[in-house]
Regions:
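Residues that mark the start of a beta-strand
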Residues: 181-185, 205, 254, 297, ...
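RNA-binding accessory domains that recognize and position tRNA/RNA substrates
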Residues: 2-216, 220-221, 235, 349, ...
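Catalytic beta-strand/loop cores that center a nucleophilic Ser/Cys/Thr
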Residues: 294-337
Length: 368
């Protein structure tokens, strides 16, 4: 199929600091707002767009071509697109791949995703890298900059924003065979499908619980262990979930946290979190495993991180992984309980396989 690039209608990208970029409309015609961020991955745009951790964010795709291989049902990480918008250099409203079932253009239109193309994405990435994360607005229907500034001024900062309730399940549900060897309670803060797949593939029966689940509801399930999922937003404001996790730690059962789950686990142990300058988003972030001394290439998507100074004051917590680019904390474990977590995504698909062993470590804790 011949690839086509939509380039008919003008679109505007306005950043919170007043910087303006002009391009062409992609996806649905309209206006959208969110926090601007960038992903340096070269593939996997459908998985990125459906990742609940991106809720409330407008993603710059550093890869030049987006949409050229279409979309396909098996490559989703949730039941709908979760990004607020997308920025790219070249947007294909046609596609060339045998397995693809639809174009990205139609996919965006169905989920009302407003985007902009034909902009210099690399210069925008450098700008955001240097200036830091900030809110932005994309519009393919409003051309007045002052009107856009007024709309953008109403958008809340990601700092202090609770977003898991927007993407987590509202009711509990089960996945896998009830005859499986292990029972896992998954606390859903915006869980990715591949986390669930990674557990069921390891002979686990899962029950996924919504936010505001009580300790009694979890203990009544009599799980062998607990999975703390990924998700969007600022972990520090999720006080109910932090208290619940603290209570789960005290049960002594195995716990594995990923991304937001990692941050909430840290908060439950008195470790603070803070907003990063620009965050980590991509599929090639180098992380050192301090236990083995090996370097792992990891997939990441987070704008908050845990405070290393607080960990240094806590004799019960051990740092297990650090980022080799900026030395931020990427993994921790408790010294006296089978509890550990990582900031990155060992389940990532597409992405490196270096850290899949963490699921096996969790299973090993269940078997003890």
């Amino acid at each position: 199929m011949q690839l086509k690039y939509q380039s008919k209608q003008k679109a505007i990208l306005l950043l919170e600091d007043g910087k303006v970029f002009e391009g062409k409309a992609a996806g649905k015609i309209g206006t959208t707002t969110g926090e601007i961020c960038f992903n340096t991955g070269m593939t996997g745009y459908q998985e990125i767009f459906t990742d609940p951790s991106y809720f409330g964010q407008i993603v710059i795709m550093n890869n030049v071509h987006v949409g050229n291989y279409g979309v396909e049902e098996s490559e989703i990480e949730s039941d709908s697109i979760k990004i607020s918008g997308m920025i790219c250099k070249k947007f294909s409203d046609g596609f060339s791949r045998k397995r693809a079932t639809d174009s990205l253009q139609h996919y965006f239109e169905k989920d009302n995703i407003v985007s902009i193309s034909d902009v210099d994405t690399r210069s925008i990435v450098r700008y955001v890298r240097d200036k830091g994360a900030m809110n932005c607005i994309i519009s393919s229907e409003i051309t007045d900059i002052e009107e856009l500034k007024a709309l953008l001024a109403k958008v809340p900062s990601m700092n202090g924003l609770e977003l898991s309730s927007k993407v987590a399940t509202k009711t509990a549900y089960e996945i896998g065979e009830k005859t499986a060897k292990y029972k896992i309670a998954v606390l859903d803060f915006g869980v990715k499908k591949n986390i669930l797949r990674s557990l069921t593939q390891r002979d686990c029966f899962l029950k996924v619980f919504p936010l505001k689940t009580t300790l009694k509801e979890l203990t009544d399930f009599n799980a062998d262990g607990y999975m703390l999922s990924n998700g969007p937003g600022d972990p520090s404001v999720m006080t109910d979930e932090i208290l619940l996790i603290k209570q789960l730690v005290e049960t002594g059962k195995p716990i594995f946290g990923i991304c937001l789950g990692h941050q909430l686990l840290a908060q439950s142990q008195g470790i603070s979190t803070y907003k990063m300058h620009a965050g980590h988003r991509g599929i090639n972030h180098p992380v050192k495993n301090i236990i083995t001394g090996k370097c792992e290439i990891t997939s990441q998507n987070h704008g908050f991180t845990v405070n290393a100074d607080d960990i240094a004051k806590n004799s019960n917590i051990e740092i297990t992984h650090v980022n080799l680019n900026d030395h931020t904390i990427e993994g921790i474990r408790l010294k006296n309980k089978p509890v550990f977590s990582v900031q990155y995504h060992p389940e990532a698909c597409p992405g490196p396989l270096d850290s899949r062993y963490l699921f096996d470590d969790f299973i090993a804790n269940l078997a003890k």
